[in-house]
Swiss-Prot record:
Residues 168-207, 219-236 have a biased composition (Low complexity). The chain crosses the membrane at residues 112-132. One of its GO terms (cellular component) is plasma membrane. One of its GO terms (molecular function) is DNA binding. Residues 19-71 form the HTH cro/C1-type domain. Belongs to the RodZ family. PROSITE patterns: HTH_CROC1. SMART domains: HTH_XRE (SM00530). This is Cytoskeleton protein RodZ. InterPro entries: Bact_Cytoskel_RodZ, Cro/C1-type_HTH, Lambda_DNA-bd_dom_sf, RodZ, RodZ-like_C. Residues 30-49 bind DNA. Cytoskeletal protein that is involved in cell-shape control through regulation of the length of the long axis. The lineage of its organism: Bacteria, Pseudomonadati, Pseudomonadota, Gammaproteobacteria, Enterobacterales. The gene is rodZ.
Amino acid sequence: MNTEATHDQNEALTTGARLRNAREQLGLSQQAVAERLCLKVSTVRDIEEDKAPADLASTFLRGYIRSYARLVHIPEEELLPGLEKQAPLRAAKVAPMQSFSLGKRRKKRDGWLMTFTWLVLFVVIGLSGAWWWQDHKAQQEEITTMADQSSAELSSNSEQGQSVPLNTSTTTDPATTSTPPASVDTTATNTQTPAVTAPAPAVDPQQNAVVSPSQANVDTAATPAPTAATTPDGAAPLPTDQAGVTTPVADPNALVMNFTADCWLEVTDATGKKLFSGMQRKDGNLNLTGQAPYKLKIGAPAAVQIQYQGKPVDLSRFIRTNQVARLTLNAEQSPAQ
């Protein structure tokens, strides 16, 4: 009867109560049990109070209970029914590996996207640099070509200018070259001895025929006004050229340019005549006149200041783009591209 009563009493007690009673019978404290089982005191307390910690897996809890039972000399078979209720086996939740694979796939995709972005950026920078270099090279080649053309034209013009005086000097009559001293001597004689002017009609007419109009102009300009009275009544006065005496009138379409640095320039008027083509140095200036409109090509727009009809010409659009300036200056309107 006593054995059956003891068995029923053990079945009525929970696993934790049985372990606590056995510990107290052996005179052990919770601290001692915890040190022997290498557990926390709170874990031993939870086991005796039949509590299952939330952060502790059921497999570990069952192992701790078995170790506790062996320590207090309780057969494990007697605790198995209570273990099924207190710490039932639960399937462990295995974290899916999909998240890792997804993260790896996302990281790989982000890497490809970043690589593609950098590749596109490098391509854009390379194309921009190539375009700028080609444009700059084309401008330099154009300036060089225009400079070569202008130098060739200047050399051809200089050769033609040198050949003209040589031809005129060879075709000049020697008699005409010797005439000016004679006229000068005659003038000097007239100014020194007025009494000798009476025999002037006896001069050989061939000498008068040799004198050219230009030489006559020189003589009349050199002799004073009273010499006209000394000439004989029968001789007609020589014609004088009054065109050289008139003062030149300023052209309203004059083109004035001042240079602050070395600059290549070409100016053409409406007739196609090149008023200037070549290199201008720093601190130089040009004053050109011709038939409007003028066509200008300027290699360095920032190095020149232009005034047309008394007004400055705006070259800021060419200076900003750093390009060769091509513009037309009309007679009655503002400069046009």
